[in-house]
Amino acid sequence: MIRFDDFLAHADKNRLQRFIPDFERVLDERYYSRTHGDYEGWWNALQQLPTAQASQIQFDVDTLMIGAEGDLDPEEQESLIKGLRGLHPWRKGPFNFFGNHIDTEWRSDWKWTRVAPHLSPLKGRFVLDVGCGSGYHCWRMLGEGAQFVLGVDPSPKFLFQFHCVKKYAPTAPVYYLPLRSEDLPPNMDAFDTVFSMGVLYHRRSPFDHIDELKAALRPGGELVLETLIVPGDENTVLTPLDRYAQMRNVWFIGSSLATKRWLERCGFEDVRIVDEGVTSLDEQRQTDWMTFQSLKDFLDPEDFSRTVEGYPAPARAVLVARKP
């Protein structure tokens, strides 16, 4: 079983020390006391990854590079591919493991390219990434010089995909906990930068989520919020009747201006809308490493500007704000 002793040991030496009992309790409740039917298969897939020294590791590039092809012999390469395939579908990336390109469903590097120019420099910062997926952006944050990165996401498969990288960078100060933002200790006031990318619309109460993000930030800290949006003014909010782009767990999608107002209502200052754009079929698509349905299947085949339910097609915005 994947354990989190390394995170707790690191937390014992930094500003999260006083929250260790809270983390231990919630990990027991949300992870150790629960079992997923596919856990054994995912664990076996992770064990297929060869024990090898990666001759290169690069986290400051669009495709995260772990090792080189020549680091593994043919038998090890075969075992590596078997293990990585055992964790299909790969949704967030891309990665390159020892010469093997993992073409993920999402071009998460494109999102980072949109977000990164608007950030306060991450060098030396204490960073939280809520809804971190496979951890791709966590590693990019480390590549920008972050001192400590904590990613949280409740998906157990993403946890295993994260550990495919962590296996070859075990001492990197990047950690993943299989938790939701609402599971985090309250009022931490600990992080210099908090990211929430692709989470807000999945929450029944967007205000509760924003408050959780604010509580994790230190005074003066920076929030980076990336979320779905719809066209409209500060009063425009879409509440799907059932599904949105085939997703059942979408509750509220505000316009950029409405989302900005939500942040201001929750007490954030210097709120800026720094990027807006429609999600393209090149950014989210089916690949050899994600063979299920993707964005194209969720849009009206006669009109790609609408979802199959008739709503505006997915568009996204990035907002940056400061906690007073």
Curated annotation (Swiss-Prot):
The UniProt entry, under Gene3D superfamilies, shows: Vaccinia Virus protein VP39
Tree of life domain: Bacteria
- The broad enzyme category this protein falls into is transferase
Q: What is its EC number?
A: 2.5.1.-
User: What are the record keywords, sorted?
Assistant: Transferase, tRNA processing
Instruction: Report a single Gene Ontology molecular function.
Output: transferase activity, transferring alkyl or aryl (other than methyl) groups
Which residues are carboxy-S-adenosyl-L-methionine-binding?
A: K92, W106, K111, G131, D153, P154, S155, M197, Y201, R316
Residues in a coiled coil are none
Q: Give me any GO biological process, just one.
A: tRNA wobble uridine modification
**Catalytically driven reaction(s):** carboxy-S-adenosyl-L-methionine + 5-hydroxyuridine(34) in tRNA = 5-carboxymethoxyuridine(34) in tRNA + S-adenosyl-L-homocysteine + H(+)
Q: Which InterPro entries match?
A: CmoB, Mo5U34_MeTrfas-like, SAM-dependent_MTases_sf
Which Pfam families does the annotation name?
Methyltransf_9 (PF08003)
What PANTHER family does the annotation carry? METHYLTRANSFERASE, TRNA U34 CARBOXYMETHYLTRANSFERASE
The protein's job, in short, is: Catalyzes carboxymethyl transfer from carboxy-S-adenosyl-L-methionine (Cx-SAM) to 5-hydroxyuridine (ho5U) to form 5-carboxymethoxyuridine (cmo5U) at position 34 in tRNAs.
**Matches recorded under HAMAP family:** tRNA_carboxymethyltr_CmoB (MF_01590)
Tell me the protein family, please.
Belongs to the class I-like SAM-binding methyltransferase superfamily. CmoB family.
Subunit organization: Homotetramer.
Report what the protein is called: tRNA U34 carboxymethyltransferase
Which species is the source of this protein?
Hahella chejuensis (strain KCTC 2396)
Q: Which gene encodes it?
A: cmoB
